[in-house]
Amino acid sequence: MLQNQDTMEILSNSTSKFPTFLLTGIPGLESAHVWISIPFCCFYAIALSGNSVILFVIITQQSLHEPMYYFLFRLSATDLGLTVSSLSTTLGILWFEAREISLYSCIVQMFFLHGFTFMESGVLVATAFDRYVAICDPLRYTTILTNSRIIQMGLLMITRAIVLILPLLLLLKPLYFCRMNALSHSYCYHPDVIQLACSDIRANSICGLIDLILTTGIDTPCIVLSYILIIHSVLRIASPEEWHKVFSTCVSHVGAVAFFYIHMLSLSLVYRYGRSAPRVVHSVMANVYLLLPPVLNPIIDSVKTKQIRKAMLSLLLTK
């Protein structure tokens, strides 16, 4: 009896149901965090301003109230959400060494981070469908992609994200966490958080894998299929001008898909199979995964999308 009591005391002293986690900046470069914050601030400023400008341009310019730009609007909105979700914790660490975060704050951050990630995956699929219809069936474009159907697609993206993220977070509630509670990077990432649990995390890992399959595992083949059909259709076009037009139409979306899925899959694989990798690898990949798409997407969209570029110029000239 006494031995069992001692065991329970040791367990209670080494675990916690409501822990405080310690976020990590760039491991090994803590003394240079203030200097490292300069490029981070630049990236955040580009992501926030670039996506905000695209949202403003699409809202204010009547000529951009078309399906293609509605999807671009949603992409910028999700990129903005991803940026804001990690902004406070990342800069808090780099500027003030504010590393502590409670479990509940961590859950809230994961809700928005993973939720916006799932939504962005859905937006990329919807945009691929938009490009497929525009190129392969242009005569029926306006009848297929009506405003009501676009709204339904948007609601479906949000619903899917919420349905996928809630079980993932609810399964964290029964877990006990070890006192060694340092996370690998500057925000709460679900695979990183569950690795600190002293409880059985098989259900959490399975749920995370199911979410990955239901997003990346389904969305990526759908996007690939849409572009296979687009390429098959374009191969029958003899005019170089038409080839160039199709390429210009699709290049920004292909770039967004590449930035998003390559880094998401790389980060997932590192957490599942690269546990021996240095901590700095986890940290750098995690920050690149969140920052690169929101920074590059508005730049590519404004450069490669002629109508967006014209709308921006008209706004600047009128002022």
UniProtKB/Swiss-Prot annotation:
It comes from the Eukaryota. GO terms for cellular component: plasma membrane. Disulfide bonds join 106-188. Coiled coil: none annotated. The chain crosses the membrane at residues 38-58, 76-96, 107-127, 150-170, 212-232, 250-270, 280-300. PANTHER family: OLFACTORY RECEPTOR 51F1, OLFACTORY RECEPTOR 56B1-RELATED. Belongs to the G-protein coupled receptor 1 family. Odorant receptor. This is Olfactory receptor 51F1. It comes from Homo sapiens.
